[in-house]
Amino acid sequence: MALGTKPAGDTPDRWEAQLRKGAVEMAALASLWGGTLYGLEIIRFLESQSSLAVAEGTIYPILNRLKAEGLLTSEWVEAEAGHPRKYYSLTPSGSQRLRLMAEAWNNFSRGLDRLLEPVLEKQGILP
């Protein structure tokens, strides 16, 4: 590969997609910190509180895996109108995992911010 060329498929969009994919599990747990939500509410919450646009085909496998790991519980609730909804809640283990993930993320992002600050300042992105 010639100096200065990027490997095939190594685009900012692809990199951002990988970053988001890694953050969705923590975001799903965080969305349930305040209480019980059903799947579509989790998706809407993530969209309203962050830049994470998560599709149903992405969130439900994650929720199922987190439930299988004992981090979430779920309960079907009959709706007054329409179909029953599956509501998800954090277990004590899920709350503990979220606290550990949030601490690790905080340390990681602070370190990265320190590294990127001079780059962003030079580009005029930061004052």
Positions of predicted regions on the chain:
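Intrinsically disordered, low-complexity serine/threonine- and proline-rich regulatory segments
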Residues: 1-27, 101
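Amphipathic alpha-helical dimerization/coiled-coil segments
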Residues: 3, 96-127
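Basic, amphipathic "hinge/linker" alpha-helix immediately C-terminal to the N-terminal HTH DNA-binding motif
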Residues: 80-102
